[in-house]
Amino acid sequence: MCNILIPSNMKTGIKKVKLHVKKNDTVTVISGNDKGKMGKVLKVFPVASRVIVEGVNIRKRHMRPLQGQTQGRIIEREFPIHSSNVKKS
């Protein structure tokens, strides 16, 4: 038996898809709650076909208190949207 390392995405049968946008591209949202907003692509997830766009799809994230902190906090950050919902500007 050979000890061959197989990437995890090949084990599950998920293929990496080439997206029409890259990091630092300026895009416009064409559908969803943030339709019409423009922003810069911060991060791309090719396997999931999702992108994070600056200022789009902002959600509140509740953070637990850490050992040194006495209080938790709520932060607002961008969450991924599907790449089919954006177009290059």
From Swiss-Prot:
Listed GO CC annotations: ribonucleoprotein complex; ribosome
Record's keyword annotation contains RNA-binding: yes
Chain coiled-coil ranges: none
The UniProt record lists the keyword Ribonucleoprotein: yes
UniProt xrefs under Pfam families: KOW, ribosomal_L24
Superkingdom, taxonomy of origin: Bacteria
Any single GO BP term: translation
Alphabetic keyword roster: Ribonucleoprotein, Ribosomal protein, RNA-binding, rRNA-binding
InterPro entries: KOW, Rib_uL2_dom2, Ribosomal_uL24, Ribosomal_uL24_CS, Ribosomal_uL24_KOW, Translation_prot_SH3-like_sf
A GO molecular-function annotation: rRNA binding
Subunit organization: Part of the 50S ribosomal subunit.
Its job: One of two assembly initiator proteins, it binds directly to the 5'-end of the 23S rRNA, where it nucleates assembly of the 50S subunit. One of the proteins that surrounds the polypeptide exit tunnel on the outside of the subunit.
Family listed: Belongs to the universal ribosomal protein uL24 family.
Protein name: Large ribosomal subunit protein uL24
Organism: Chlorobium chlorochromatii (strain CaD3)
Lineage of source species: Bacteria, Pseudomonadati, Chlorobiota, Chlorobiia, Chlorobiales
